[in-house]
Amino acid sequence: AEMARQLGIPAEVLDAAATAALDPSVTMDVCGSVYFPKDCHLSPSRFIAALESELRTLGVQFLWETDVHGFEVEGSSIRALKTSAGLVEADEFVLTGGVWSAELARHLGLRIPMQAGKGYSLTLASPRQLRARCSICTEARLAVTPMDGALRFGGTMEMSGLDESITQRRVRGITRAVPEYFPAFAESDFADIQP
């Protein structure tokens, strides 16, 4: 908390009773917490939907299910994208290919030091208890986020390139950690959930 305050981030050290008072509808097994009153979170899907809607009002065109194969370049400027839907011309381009940005940039002779990673999370659509606030259980490397009536439990990040396989040990780490901090939950709550 002290380090956060030195950086200008409001933070308060709370004992177990004060932690419980912040979210009285949820049972937590903790000695205390650090509360960040200005902390916030969002629903990624709602954020992206709102962003897309706003961009459309500004005249942005989206080409879904379209692969970029390369670029047409004049001098030091990109003139067009070569895509599975044909050439796409524009005055300016923004490279937002996520983990594929480095590969796309290579077509332009650029090197972007980027490596794909995957985070693990499990979401309970109808949780036994719904937290009002986010939590980070640092010892277990567990993030807990309420999202539109659901509760998401996020675990570790794995730097794995584009490998989409699931490491079951990491999934078990999440399902075992949740009841340690939130006794109303059990590992069996996650039995039918796919990461």
Model-derived regions, located:
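Dinucleotide-binding Rossmann-like beta1-alpha1 core, especially the glycine-rich loop
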Residues: 1-16
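Helical element adjacent to the flavin cofactor pocket in flavoenzyme catalytic cores
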Residues: 2-3, 26-92
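Proline-centered flexible-loop/turn and helix-kink motifs
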Residues: 5, 24, 183-186
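Short loop/edge segments at beta-strand edges and connector loops
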Residues: 15-16, 64-66, 189-194
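Active-site substrate-recognition segment that forms the wall
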Residues: 70-78, 86-195
